[in-house]
């Protein structure tokens, strides 16, 4: 193994040391929380040791693809498929920070790729992981910047690529406040494939060399809906027998309460309407089910195989099926936006050609939402009452509903192409 002899400045070494010590100090509490949460969800305890870098040894040419959770894993899928087609001899190792992210990856790829939890960002965990996985390159989806991960990859001359990279102005200012730590890490990145010019400018501003930054667009526009997903959506839609259906996907916390309240109002004008409610995190499944029943609504749970035909709320309490559930719906609300979570990916429902709703908080997907807004493929709502009014209105106006959905799909189609640029960029740099 060859090591890069480049040295960081003394200030960065001190800050790196302080950062690593802080991570070491809080690690026992992180593991305790993992064990505690595992009482209710035993899967959280499974393979916990992988988070300390103890993963199965890999052989051959290993491409390490890291995606923090479900959304980033879905975004990585077309890229992974393309890399496997163009380089059938490589081994793809997919990692995620969450069990939901790994579950999504397994659902999409089966035994085509290898899987592991991403190691916590301590020097020891990263070292053990790299010793065992021995990756040829590291591909990070979006902006998961972990100092020890990137620093040790540089030391081992493992190129680090940030793909579909985005950086908000708020995050850029945060990195500027710790320039002594951030700049050397940014200079260790081999290539940044930014979603938009403003993202590229911010990465250059915080230390990435201009020659290593390219604007490729967002690979999320290259949304890929497999035929088996389309078939499953058609089957579910057939079961719903022409009912007006709206879906709220990737919802958070008390946002679920607001959506249930909105559906109660929708039912006043459309008594046969169905809400498909899909919380972002599994630990919200039970509270959402209880809240639904408390409001006097008829509930069906997908995890239990219950028939949604007679239900008023269909709880999507399974993993990896959100894309299919979008396809069985007439309208879609994308969660994390009625509260200050920054929203989630609106291109998943837009790829089905259905109207998209969002609350006012979509700063995590600002560029994508702006393109949808420019072409009137998304409707913004201020609160639950506003959402209920818009949903009810579009249920009554088939022509307008179809027009908005087609505009959303057109935005997706005309912005495709980032995937080819990203895959070509990775291959030519390896």
Features from the language model and the residues they span:
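Nucleotide-activated sugar donor-binding and catalytic core shared by glycosyltransferases
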Residues: 7-430
């Amino acid at each position: 193994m060859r090591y890069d002899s480049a040295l960081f400045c003394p200030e960065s070494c001190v800050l790196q040391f302080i950062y690593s010590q802080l991570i070491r100090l809080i690690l026992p509490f992180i593991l305790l929380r993992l064990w505690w949460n595992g009482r209710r969800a035993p899967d959280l305890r499974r393979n916990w040791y992988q988070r300390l870098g103890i993963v199965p040894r890999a052989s051959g040419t290993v491409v390490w693809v890291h995606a923090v959770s479900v959304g980033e894993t879905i975004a990585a899928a077309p890229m992974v498929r393309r890399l496997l087609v163009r380089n059938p001899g490589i081994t793809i190792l997919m990692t995620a920070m969450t069990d939901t992210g790994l579950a999504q990856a397994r659902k999409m790829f089966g035994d085509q790729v290898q899987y592991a939890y991403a190691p916590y960002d301590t020097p020891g965990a990263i070292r053990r992981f790299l010793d065992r996985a021995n990756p040829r390159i590291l591909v990070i989806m979006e902006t998961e910047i972990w100092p020890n991960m990137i620093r040790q990859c540089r030391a081992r001359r493992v190129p680090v690529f940030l793909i579909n990279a985005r950086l908000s102005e708020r995050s850029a200012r945060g990195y500027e406040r710790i320039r002594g730590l951030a700049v050397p890490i940014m200079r260790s990145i081999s290539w940044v494939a930014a979603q938009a010019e403003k993202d590229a400018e911010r990465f250059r501003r915080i230390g990435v060399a201009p020659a290593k930054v390219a604007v490729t667009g967002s690979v999320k526009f290259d949304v890929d809906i497999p035929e088996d997903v389309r078939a499953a959506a058609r089957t579910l839609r057939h079961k719903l027998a022409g009912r007006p259906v709206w879906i709220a996907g990737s919802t958070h916390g008390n946002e679920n309460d607001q959506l249930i309240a909105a559906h109660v109002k929708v039912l006043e004008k459309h008594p046969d309407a169905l809400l498909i409610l899909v919380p972002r995190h599994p630990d919200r499944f039970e509270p959402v089910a209880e809240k639904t029943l408390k409001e006097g609504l008829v509930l069906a749970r997908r995890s239990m195989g219950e028939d949604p035909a007679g239900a008023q709320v269909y709880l999507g309490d399974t993993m990896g099926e959100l894309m299919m559930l979008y396809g069985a719906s007439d309208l879609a609300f994308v969660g994390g936006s009625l509260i200050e979570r920054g929203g989630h990916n609106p291109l998943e429902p837009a790829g089905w050609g259905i109207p998209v709703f969002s609350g006012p908080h979509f700063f995590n997907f600002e560029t994508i939402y702006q393109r949808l807004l420019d072409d009137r493929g998304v409707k913004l709502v201020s609160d639950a009452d506003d959402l209920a009014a818009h949903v009810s209105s579009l249920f009554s106006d088939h022509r307008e509903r179809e027009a908005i959905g087609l505009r959303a799909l057109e935005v997706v189609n005309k912005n495709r192409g980032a995937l080819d640029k990203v895959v070509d960029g990775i291959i030519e740099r390896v």
